[in-house]
Amino acid sequence: MGIISFIFALAEDMLLAAIPAVGFAMVFNVPQRALRWCALLGAIGHGSRMIMMSAGFNIEWATFLAALLVGSIGIQWSRWYLAHPKIFTVAAVIPMFPGISAYTAMISAVKISHFGYSEEMMILLLSNFLKASSIVGALSIGLSIPGLWLYRKRPRV
């Protein structure tokens, strides 16, 4: 993949990630002045995950690092705009949720229930379930660590 096609793919990925970030921010009643920042943070998070995955990271670690980035930027923006960090961060990480892995695991469970046990369906179910669970765990831990680091009351040592 050439650099120009990668930049276009990255721009497309970031633009398409900003749309659900704004949509979920509207569902969560985020103030209108913060919607553009939710879109930008969602685009930054999803774009950074895409860059890391194309650099060779697996999706779980790339999601964890992208969530760390989103959490850190959200805390900084909350100080600038005098708002809670969750206003920016929660809607921004939703585009990174593992919809395809969770859906495939659910469909595999339904097929096992309907057609009976088969080894390949069980492998598909477990691998996709563990992948989706790991991504959700990476999102939640990565989003909470910057707050634990930056709002710490006691000295680090």
From Swiss-Prot:
InterPro entries in alphabetical order: ThrE_2, ThrE_Dicarb/AminoAcid_Exp, YjjB
Keywords: Cell inner membrane, Cell membrane, Membrane, Transmembrane, Transmembrane helix, Transport
One Pfam family, short name: ThrE_2
GO biological process: succinate transport
Compartments, record wording: Cell inner membrane
Main location: membrane
Protein's UniProt keywords contain Transit peptide: no
Entry GO CC: plasma membrane
Domain of life the protein comes from: Bacteria
Membrane topology, record value: Multi-pass membrane protein
Transmembrane segments: 2-22, 55-75, 87-107, 129-149
Family per record: Belongs to the ThrE exporter (TC 2.A.79) family.
Quaternary structure note: The transporter is composed of YjjB and YjjP.
Function: Involved in succinate export with YjjP. Both proteins are required for export.
Name of protein: Probable succinate transporter subunit YjjB
